[in-house]
Amino acid sequence: MKSLQKGFTLIELMIVVAIIGILAAFAIPAYNDYIARSQAAEGVSLADGLKVRIAENLQDGECKGPDADPASGVVGNKDTGKYALAEIDGTYDASKTAAGDPNGCKVNITYGQGTAADKISKLITGKKLVLDQLVNGSFIQGDGTDLADKFIPNAVKAKK
């Protein structure tokens, strides 16, 4: 009687392992970029949260109001998130009136200074995204940004 052997040969298993290794070589860097982009987006969310504070400061004719003072009820000009710190900066320019002009107010976002700074992607740690606020209230990437272009969210990316 002839016995039938069923299963995979060693060479077939080695080929499968090699294919998985090749796929992983492409997938891991792409996944790391995806994580860095998602963490970078948190900074823009923090900046959006500062829009109300900027508007309140602009009523006094300035971008950056007083530092936080809980005793007097003054809210500060910075927000800390999980991966980033966003701070209001700049000098208000009242002469700018067109909706697409920067009004002089900026938000500086520094990555790696959040509450979970040890968990941030090494691709964006210590990098800075500067956002200029436009007269219409939206943000656009400003000068002084050293965050790699591929990690800057499209909503604020400067047109080139």
Swiss-Prot record:
InterPro entries, alphabetized: N_methyl_site (IPR012902), Pilin (IPR001082), Pilin-like (IPR045584), T4P/T2SS_Core (IPR050470)
Name a GO CC annotation attached to this entry: membrane
Residues with the modification N-methylphenylalanine, per the entry, are 8
Kindly give the Pfam families that the UniProt entry links to this protein: N_methyl, Pilin
Q: Which PROSITE patterns match?
A: PROKAR_NTER_METHYL
Show the propeptide residue ranges.
1-7
Q: What keywords is this UniProt entry annotated with?
A: Fimbrium, Membrane, Methylation, Transmembrane, Transmembrane helix
Q: How does it sit in the membrane?
A: Single-pass membrane protein
- Its transmembrane ranges are 8-28
Q: Which GO terms describe its biological process?
A: cell adhesion
The record's subcellular location field reads: Fimbrium; Membrane
Q: Which family does it belong to?
A: Belongs to the N-Me-Phe pilin family.
Q: How does it assemble?
A: The pili are polar flexible filaments of about 5.4 nanometers diameter and 2.5 micrometers average length; they consist of only a single polypeptide chain arranged in a helical configuration of five subunits per turn in the assembled pilus.
Q: What is this protein called?
A: Fimbrial protein
Instruction: List the source organism.
Output: Dichelobacter nodosus (Bacteroides nodosus)
Q: What is the lineage of its organism?
A: Bacteria, Pseudomonadati, Pseudomonadota, Gammaproteobacteria, Cardiobacteriales
Q: Which gene encodes it?
A: fimA
